[in-house]
Amino acid sequence: MKKIVVLLGMLLAPWFSSAVQAKGEAGEFDYYAMALSWSPEHCAIKPADRDQCSRQLGFVLHGLWPQYQRGYPSSCTRERLDPAMEQEFAGLYPSRFLYRHEWEKHGTCSGLSQHDFHQLASDLRQKREDPGRLSVSCRAAAQKPLPAQGGSGQCQRLAGPGQHHGGLRRRWRFLREVYICLNKEGTDAVTCSDEMQKRELPSCGQPDFLLRTVR
């Protein structure tokens, strides 16, 4: 069984906003990071997102992101999203905006066709309940902490057994996202890059985090 590496990052701003972006070549990357957002936290930050926040959702797919060991490629081609993808993979994302945004910014760097990229994302999303195959990085964005072991315990139940690093940054401790790191084929777990783990370390040194309820 693959080890699960859980990082609790309590950032209000997205982790990847401070990572290094590069134009990149389609298909040239090191691994995938699949981001699963905890919808109640997203909606607490962006309540105007009616597509997502008008429904009682838990974990939702934010995206499947090609990654380098340092940084990540972005917008590798100018290929626009085929509207048919929204119909063929209905429900893959919680909002229509994400279909276009995720394909054009991240999917174009996968080296896959639109159908194959969305199929891979769909397959991996469905396998999130089988964490034994995955390496996970949890990110949280905070107000009333769970007990000292509550945060790690909650994340462990979400992600499965393994190694844990928990924490906060800028006093924000609500669970926001879980990152699942996989090889380029999406078949096996890989350890999230040293850069990713180091960047989350200031957040991940604390023993608890908060989890908003689904309403």
From Swiss-Prot:
Entry's family note = Belongs to the RNase T2 family.
Originating species: Aeromonas hydrophila
Sorted UniProt keywords = Cytoplasm, Endonuclease, Hydrolase, Nuclease, Periplasm, Signal
GO BP, one annotated term: RNA catabolic process
Give the residue ranges for region: Disordered: 144-166
- Single GO molecular-function term? RNA binding
* GO cellular component terms given for this protein: cytoplasm; periplasmic space
Q: What does this protein do?
A: One of the few RNases that cleave the phosphodiester bond between any two nucleotide. Shows a preference for adenylic acid.
The residues responsible for catalysis, as annotated, are H62, E102, H106
Report disulfide bridges, numbered on this chain: none
Provide the leader sequence positions: 1-22
User: What name is this protein filed under?
Assistant: Ribonuclease
What Pfam families does the annotation carry? Ribonuclease_T2 (PF00445)
- What EC designation does it have? 3.1.27.-
| Xref: InterPro entries | RNase_T2-like, RNase_T2-like_sf, RNase_T2_His_AS_1, RNase_T2_His_AS_2
State its location(s): Periplasm; Cytoplasm
